[in-house]
């Protein structure tokens, strides 16, 4: 029975194999998964799948050596892959991680990866490798809504078999759950259950690309905490400091809270809101200082900071516990000494920092944007990253004493987990002479300030003394006053005319006498002021003095006519003058008076 089975197995192998890029010959070496031990860790909100694979080169008449092999992802989970790593078993150093590159297989859909072997595999040889994959958002709450007092149950669907382009001789699967409370699970191969473990297999002679749905429904109250968006800003200064600030948007992606929230029950009953998140710990670099933690309202005083030998542990406690569907936003910032992360050789600089740092255990970051602000004048910027990242066009950042802006590297990546906490290296060139730019700008600014003050106190910025212009200004001012006084004097005449008209109607001689007295008094005062201004004009040597003198003579004649009109009115009232004669005389007086006023107006216009 052994020989026919082996022949059939080899036939399946040759029939399902597709050539891998980088093979030693045009015909792909026949490989087989001799033994696979899978561990599926579902104890958190991540699905961590670790497979210990014994890969064998069958030979089968082929003399070509295998320099690489293929990995395939399950179609149901491939879209949620966050991390894929392959390592030779027994070698724990990060430097011994095998090179993994995504590839395509003709005629096959899905995601495939080529893994380069450290040593070419001869026919009949074997190698043990460990394949580690981490998937996010594959544990779905069921029911999707729970009350504050209920526990959270989730459903996971995967594959009973190790999904591979190669046949597998034997394989087992161990599933680690978050609790012993299991509602249901698939029963393929009569699995054994012990506490929070499910053991499947062994499965023998499994063909390539085999699939059989594995499903488990169990209690999982671990924190389903997800960073939906995060912006990490790293500002580098050559004066000894690196400032780091992280803007974090958090969401509880577990079962949504149904019904009201009772803080009283939450504090009184230990199991109330068991799947909620009260606080979590963030690990900062050991050299972190000036740490701050705030949100939209302001500083959050419920946080705690613990300084350890190799790190700074920060307990972040939001203002309210996070239940399913609830969100929060906060900002964490700190400073680092640049000598621990910035290296240079002449004008060549290298910044070695983590692309993403620890935020909380079992972290998931849906979207991360990293902005690295380099000193002004940095050029020839290059980035070395341990994994693929995307870059947006570089930006410019302006701050104090900047002239043409600091270059900003903008990089982003989606779906990150703890395995992405690795260093990136930013290489750039910087002329050290530019370090003097800011001090020189400060010196120049103070120099200009002091020089301006010296000039200001030594120069006379008052209006230039021009005798002619000053005389003209004085004459204009005096003329303006003369015009005002003349207008007031003309107003007196009009007011006296109204008094005469009232006298003719009332025949009250006291009214007329009072009006005459008021006219004489005010006219005398105004005429005196005009005469004084006339003398000032004469002092200034202005030819306007003669015009004012002429206007004064004309005004005297106007006054005489005004008083004569009043006398005529008295004679009319006393019956000494006939009305016809009065009217005729009044016309003559008014005509002469109007002629004089017109002459005065012409003089005023000339002024």
Swiss-Prot record:
One Pfam family matching this protein: Ribophorin_I
Cytoplasmic face of the membrane: 458-607
Glycan-modified residues: 299
GO biological process: protein N-linked glycosylation; protein N-linked glycosylation via asparagine
Membrane topology field: Single-pass type I membrane protein
Tissue expression: Expressed in all tissues tested.
Entry GO CC: cytosol; endoplasmic reticulum; endoplasmic reticulum membrane; melanosome; membrane; oligosaccharyltransferase complex; oligosaccharyltransferase complex A; oligosaccharyltransferase complex B
Cross-link entry Glycyl lysine isopeptide (Lys-Gly) (interchain with G-Cter in SUMO2), positions: 538
Localisation: Endoplasmic reticulum membrane; Melanosome
N6-acetyllysine: residues bearing it: 187, 538
Pathway note: Protein modification; protein glycosylation
Record's comment on post-translational modification: Ubiquitinated by the ECS(ASB11) complex. Ubiquitinated by RNF128, leading to degradation in a proteasome/lysosome-dependent manner. Ufmylated by UFL1 in response to endoplasmic reticulum stress, promoting reticulophagy of endoplasmic reticulum sheets.
Keywords, sorted A to Z: Acetylation, Endoplasmic reticulum, Glycoprotein, Isopeptide bond, Membrane, Signal, Transmembrane, Transmembrane helix, Ubl conjugation
Transmembrane segments: 439-457
Signal peptide range: 1-23
InterPro entries: Ribophorin_I (IPR007676)
Molecular functions (GO terms): RNA binding
Lumenal side: 24-438
Family indicated by similarity: Belongs to the OST1 family.
Subunit structure, interactors included: Component of the oligosaccharyltransferase (OST) complex. OST exists in two different complex forms which contain common core subunits RPN1, RPN2, OST48, OST4, DAD1 and TMEM258, either STT3A or STT3B as catalytic subunits, and form-specific accessory subunits. STT3A complex assembly occurs through the formation of 3 subcomplexes. Subcomplex 1 contains RPN1 and TMEM258, subcomplex 2 contains the STT3A-specific subunits STT3A, DC2/OSTC, and KCP2 as well as the core subunit OST4, and subcomplex 3 contains RPN2, DAD1, and OST48.
Stated role: Subunit of the oligosaccharyl transferase (OST) complex that catalyzes the initial transfer of a defined glycan (Glc(3)Man(9)GlcNAc(2) in eukaryotes) from the lipid carrier dolichol-pyrophosphate to an asparagine residue within an Asn-X-Ser/Thr consensus motif in nascent polypeptide chains, the first step in protein N-glycosylation. N-glycosylation occurs cotranslationally and the complex associates with the Sec61 complex at the channel-forming translocon complex that mediates protein translocation across the endoplasmic reticulum (ER). All subunits are required for a maximal enzyme activity.
Name of protein: Dolichyl-diphosphooligosaccharide--protein glycosyltransferase subunit 1
Organism for this UniProt entry: Homo sapiens (Human)
